[in-house]
Amino acid sequence: MHKQPLSPFTKQQLLPQEETLEIFKKKGELFIGIPKETAYQEKRICLTPDAVYALVNNGHRVLIESGAGNGANFSDKDYSEAGAEITKDTAKVFSCPMILKVEPPTLEQIKLINPQTILISALQIKTQTKKYFAALASKRVTALAFEFIRDTDGSYPAVKSLSEIAGTASVLIASELLSETKNGNGIMFGNISGVPPIEVVILGAGTVGEFAARSALGLGAGVKVFDNSITKLRCIQTQLGRPLFTSTIQPKNLLKALKRCDVVIGAVRGTNRSPIVVSDTMVRAMKKGAIIIDVSIDMGGCFETSDVTTHRQPTYIKHNVVHYCVPNIPARYPRTATVSISNIFTPYLLKIAEDGGIENSLRFDKGLKNGLYFYHGILTSKSVGEWFDLKHSDINLLIF
């Protein structure tokens, strides 16, 4: 007689099965120190009160030096209400396990840093010396340069964001300088019925060039863009969504455009230095009272007549042409620049904590790893090593 099965399941189904469990990463708790910027005319701060609130709500601590946000119009009270701790003790801020700065720390500030600290700031490789890297190495610091942090699409979010500000600002500054109150030609930067529009020449079709063109076109100016990359010129037309005068940098065409224009914006980048695109002779041929805004002055400038100026004394006149050659244009708008930088920093900080610390984040995020130039006191950036003739190691051999 055939026995009835006691279970509706097959013999195979009744065998013990492997259970797949989700492996939870242990979240890290961040203790972030934000010192007051001491660099000349630097008014920005890395995090807004809203960003601090988001971090504190996620269980992190933020210690801010008193007055750090004043330049960007964020008071100590704003940060305190967001959950930050405020101190007047600079050394206490620099003793935090993680330090956020806009400008790279000075040699005196590095002395205040504890060993094995994580430093996130700009690197500004062109302004550094071997002493800076030796000081970081002696403290066994893990350092990230935010201008080298790469996004998933291959772009550099911090550089792009600040370039957008610089591009838009260059047009607003030119508009101000053209007005009679600033000893300009008394011309309005706009499209007024019956009045010929302003002629603007933009050198360089990168992010700065794109946003300068966008702003100038929005104000009704006639815009001509020059760049030696056909791909970039094609791209700027697509981004702006309208036909535009574009040309490669040919001296004859450029001189013709310079003679007629009211404003020239220089935004040409080079590998080590910006190439000089506009010669002294070309500047002499320009209109009296025309405006030169050299955005690429931080890399040497692309006008032969360019000399570095400051936010306090931003202009000088040479060959009857007004020159504006301030290296750090976004610092003119510290609050906007702060919000922009903060929007980039905050997701990265939350992700670092979620991954269980900087080590794991560097392991999983190639873009963040690209910004690393020191790992526990070992130089990992090839470009820094070659620039300063320093020994460097491949980060992929240190983190795997």
Pin down the residues of each PLM region.
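Rossmann-like NAD(P)-binding element
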Residues: 91-107, 241, 245-277, 291
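An N-terminal-biased, well-structured beta-alpha scaffold segment characteristic
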Residues: 16-135, 139
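Generic hydrophobic/aromatic pocket-lining and core-packing "Φ" positions
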Residues: 52, 76, 110, 133, ...
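Glycine/serine-rich phosphate-binding loop and adjoining beta1-alpha1 elements at the start
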Residues: 1-31, 37, 107-198, 326
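Adenosine-phosphate binding glycine-rich loop
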Residues: 147-173, 177-188, 302-400
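Glycine/threonine-rich flexible loop motifs
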Residues: 41-46, 109-112, 269-278, 302-306
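Rossmann-fold NAD(P)-binding glycine/threonine-rich loop
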Residues: 126-153, 281-325
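Glycine-rich phosphate/diphosphate-binding loop of Rossmann-like nucleotide-binding domains
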Residues: 35-36, 40-69, 181-266
